[in-house]
Amino acid sequence: MEVQLTNRQQHILWATVRHYIATAEPVGSKALVDEYDLGVSSATIRNVMGVLEKSGLLYQPHTSAGRIPSDSGYRIYVDQLITPGLRDAARTDVLAKEVELALQNRLHWEDWSLEAVLQGAAQILATVSGCISLITMPQTTTAILRHLQLMQIEANKIMLIVVTDDYETHSKLMNLSPTEEEAKLDADGIDHELKIVSNFLNTHLRGRSLLELATLDWSDLDQEFQRYGEFLKGSVTELTRRHLTPTTTQIMVRGVAEVLRQPEFSQLQQVQTIIQLLEEEQDQLWRLIFAEPETEEAGKSKVTVRIGTENPLEPIRTCTLITSTYRRGLLPVGSVGVLGPTRLDYDSAIAVVAAAADYLSDAFS
């Protein structure tokens, strides 16, 4: 959502969101004057809040009440106002470290089953965040590499062809930007080089699982073949992602009872639909939280924040869902997240989800 706010509007929206998160009460100008050093009068704050309301970022639940953030207001807060200048960086850094240390010290990978470890991680995440925590089981693939070939199809353009053990064939194109030395190679020279690389890779990689290949360090290629390393790594990772199969859509869920006591969940029918989603319709929720953001860079997990009506599942369209993937090498194999009301401490929740995803990525790599 592209909304251009002045510095004053940003600070007043930030203060309104922070105050409402803390109190769950509609916010008036007097409360902001008393609690925040905004450097302006109550009348000025009222005028700015009126402008923010007209912009759809705040609204009044009742005519005589103060204002509360809309989904759009929370979106601006998350996208533009959680910055080093406005957020409480020290507090969120402490929370992230608390999650990391708790996960390191309380989980016993050698003695516990994988499910027990992830249940324990979910409990820690729920306790620290104050939200419902969600962690999926890691996914895998049984596909095996049968054959791999690199071939030139045009000048400075090559194709990778991969055949798996089920005889499925996959291909991907790469544009080369040759160095001055490489540009001297004629078509026969490039074909010869590609055959050497293909033979080397087939000799060393045939019979290995795609999951294993996706975690390889392709920088180990001989120096003269380094220009193919990033292409091979990205292509194999993408292919492996396509072959990932949900061995289970089970989600570890913790913290439900505490969160559903929040004032936002006072309607019994709403609570029942959320519980039904968490307990009986996990396959729908799994597909949502394991959806990898299109903008996510290879090998880097991004925290995704879905606020209110941005959630496609009806039971949680009044909630905020914050998720990130955890990885085995470059490959996303599972997700970790928290679910709570839109009146959520976004700074803290984003920090702890990122910390948990990083910990699990390190543990699985």
From Swiss-Prot:
Transcription is among the record's keywords: yes
Q: Which GO terms describe its molecular function?
A: DNA binding
What Pfam families does the record tag this protein with? HrcA
Which biological process, per GO, is one annotated for this protein? Answer: negative regulation of DNA-templated transcription
Q: Which domain of life is it from?
A: Bacteria
The protein's matches in SUPFAM superfamilies, at most eight in alphabetical order, are given as: GAF domain-like (SSF55781), Winged helix' DNA-binding domain (SSF46785)
Sorted UniProt keywords: Repressor, Stress response, Transcription, Transcription regulation
Q: What does this protein do?
A: Negative regulator of class I heat shock genes (grpE-dnaK-dnaJ and groELS operons). Prevents heat-shock induction of these operons.
HAMAP family the UniProt entry points to:
HrcA
UniProt record similarity statement: Belongs to the HrcA family.
Protein name per the record:
Heat-inducible transcription repressor HrcA
Lineage of this protein's species? Bacteria, Bacillati, Cyanobacteriota, Cyanophyceae, Nostocales
Q: What is the gene name? A: hrcA
